[in-house]
Amino acid sequence: MSPFTDPSRTDAGTDPALDGPDESLRRSLGVGRRRFLSTCTAVAAGAVAAPVLGAAPALAQDRGRGHGHDHGHGHGHDRGQVLVPADKRGIILYTVRDATARDPLASDLPSGFREVFKQLARHGYRQVEFAGYNQHANAPGGASLESVKGAKLLRSWLDDYGLRAQGNHGFIPSSWPLTTEDTETFKKHLEIANILGMDHMGTGGDPTGSSYRADWDVAADKWNALGRIARREGIKLYTHNHDGAYGFLLDGGPLDDQGRPTRSSGIRKLEYFLKVTDPKVVWLEMDIFWAHVAQYKFHSYTAHDGSTRKDVFDPAGLVARNNKRYPLFHAKDGVVSTTNGMGYDMVPFGTGVIDYRTFFSRVGERNYHNPMIEDDNSPSATDPAQSLREAKISYDNLAALRKRC
């Protein structure tokens, strides 16, 4: 992969003997020498290239220690400005979905929305992103809180524990043109979002799974229409990404047997979506983990003329160029994997190699973006306390991030 130049890095060595091609690569990647050399060794030994772009030593601390304060002294990683202010530290509740779904009558662990809110607030979180409004039937409020009454109850608990709802992965109509039924359901979810005090409402899926421009044009028309409805209710509508959405759009070259293009101009799908949607009504939530998977997987394309061209995705660069379009992030981490085809295995935030210090330093606007901790794998069938315990580890590591001086 070709590296991107990272102007935020200032800790590169100055020994002339180290200023060869490998040192230039290391600097541009924003990787410490030890990590760079070990990664290069692993790549040389393996059949599949390991992802190195954005890699950095993990921020994991001893699991018994916390870093929930915004102090700027002490350890080396505490020097400089806090990268994620305390009131911007959030978590998507999908990460602790086993806890909200747990039967409070069968466990002493926090169970249901109210007790989970209480525990997350104790960890230090100030924001949450919903992933639906269902919990265990024995929890206060009952199984479904997807109603005006349920939203008012949820809001009261959020207020009790000093939490703010910042978004939801919820209902996005499947119909297009919109049916009356879907439109009314969508408006009901906007009403719930307003009761909960959300600025944003969205989805956990991509606008479309297609690789073709025509389908992305349809998706843009639909999202523009939905975004206008949401804006009238004071809500910013956002979409999400997995790795495929930052793959390359097929928009030219020879046609296949169904009349579809087979080659690319080099524009990525969600980059095209950014261009053809109205910035006043459509926003995006970057899942930074999946964006790095896309960086690993989609680093070259076949151009219209049949040539192969290299183009390494730069997630932080895309956000920096479109900062106000990305009010939300999913912040989840990964360790290098050369066997799963993605380049990374998910781990709790701060215990992997994705360089969040550099990412947040480069995108800036720390009082605008809302990073939500996510770990798809935190719930455990054998360790019911794991997801909330790892939520604390992730919070501490998010709070520990400091901008380099």
Task: Go through the PLM ranges and name each one.
Residues 53-94, 98:
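C-terminal segment of N-terminal export signals and the immediately downstream linker at the start
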Residues 230-348, 353:
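Acidic/histidine-rich catalytic cores of soluble enzymes
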Residues 103-120, 179-191, 311-318, 356:
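Short, acidic/polar
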Residues 1-31:
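N-terminal secretory signal peptides
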Residues 41-42, 46, 159, 173-283, ...:
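Active-site acidic/histidine proton-transfer and metal-coordination neighborhood
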Residues 111-133, 196-197:
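Catalytic domains of carbohydrate-active enzymes, especially glycoside hydrolases
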Residues 19, 23-30, 35-58:
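N-terminal export signals
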Residues 80-85, 117-122, 143-166, 185-197, ...:
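Acidic (Asp/Glu)-rich catalytic clusters
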